[in-house]
Amino acid sequence: MKRFLFFMALLCIWCISFNSVKAVSNAELQDTSRFEHIVSKGDTGGGDGKYIELSTLKDVSTSGSTKSVEAKIYVVLPSSDLVREYTIHYDYNLNYSFAHLVAKVPEFKQQFPDFYLGEIWNIKMDNSGIVGTVKAQQDYTLNGESKPTKPGYKGYEYVTFLTPTDFDFESYHVANRVFKKVFGIFYDDVSR
């Protein structure tokens, strides 16, 4: 029994050494062959920003009406000496893309005679069509050293810089940019 426990402990140590966390520094994020800076309205110009790790972008779609993407996105917060890595999964309901809703205006007007184009904004505010789920997160210092990842506050575990993806908010623009990197077109330009 002791040999078995010793072997299991040795196996765990061996696995951990091969699966160690790969830290990312702020300097590495500037490598445009590996990362793309997402220029967004939330950037203050003080060195903060969001970066997509290009090699992690994956189309994981399983349905025709919903496109799904997984990626690693890094959020840099210099004032907190923090680079936060998010592994995120986005689901995009193509029936709620802006272009698709505009194409349906004649149908909406038939059902609701007072319907006008501005109502699409209200539809998008009620349901953006994008759902983002954080699958994992890891914190690093700006120099790339691992840092303990703090859990979210109770009730806010899923509120991040990237989720929820409410229409016309920062997180929505980031998700739209991720969609374009994978499919070559912005989510809101897709017409079914």
Report residues per predicted region:
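Intrinsically disordered, low-complexity regions enriched in Ser/Pro/Gly/Gln/His and often acidic
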Residues: 7-8, 114
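N-terminal secretory-pathway/extracellular module detecting exported/lumenal segments
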Residues: 23-87, 91-192
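Bacterial N-terminal signal peptides
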Residues: 8-15
